[in-house]
UniProtKB/Swiss-Prot annotation:
Domain of life: Eukaryota
CDD domains (UniProt xref): Ribosomal_S12
Family per record: Belongs to the universal ribosomal protein uS12 family.
One GO cellular component, as annotated: small ribosomal subunit
PROSITE patterns in the record: RIBOSOMAL_S12 (PS00055)
UniProt protein name: Small ribosomal subunit protein uS12cz/uS12cy
Subcellular location as annotated: Plastid, Chloroplast
Entry GO MF terms: rRNA binding; structural constituent of ribosome
Assembly: Part of the 30S ribosomal subunit.
Major site of localization recorded for this protein: plastid
Function according to Swiss-Prot or TrEMBL: With S4 and S5 plays an important role in translational accuracy. Located at the interface of the 30S and 50S subunits.
């Protein structure tokens, strides 16, 4: 326990909270351009080919973002909207691409959980 004199001399340091998505710079989403679209394999015990894109954001950061849903139309130079949110079995992937906005079209034939994949209500 510090004495009163020690506390006067130098005050207690505030605990700084570290953001989990620094490339967004405090914004809920950021626009970016795809520089590379490719697949990577998840860590053990999972096995798949997960679709990801390397995105250059308007904030100047170059990040790796996950492309959710089945099938996509993204390629190099596609303009996408990126939100925070990591993918647990892909190390280094801390962002998601928002489907149904800008160049990323919604998932085809999606019936449930449509709002997360940018799909309009079927007629």
């Amino acid at each position: 326990m510090p004495t009163i004199k020690q506390l006067i001399r130098n005050t207690r340091q505030q605990i700084r909270n570290v953001t989990k998505s620094p490339a967004l710079r405090g914004c809920p989403q950021r626009r970016g351009t795809c520089t590379r679209v490719y697949t990577i394999t998840p860590k053990k015990p999972n096995s798949a080919l997960r679709k990801v894109a390397r995105v250059r954001l308007t904030s100047g950061f170059e990040i790796t973002a996950y492309i959710p849903g089945i099938g996509h139309n993204l390629q190099e130079h596609s303009v996408v909207l990126v939100r925070g949110g990591r993918v647990k079995d892909l190390p280094g992937v801390r962002y998601h691409i928002v489907r149904g906005t800008l160049d990323a079209v919604g998932v085809k034939d999606r019936q449930q959980g449509r709002s997360k994949y940018g799909v309009k209500k079927p007629k």
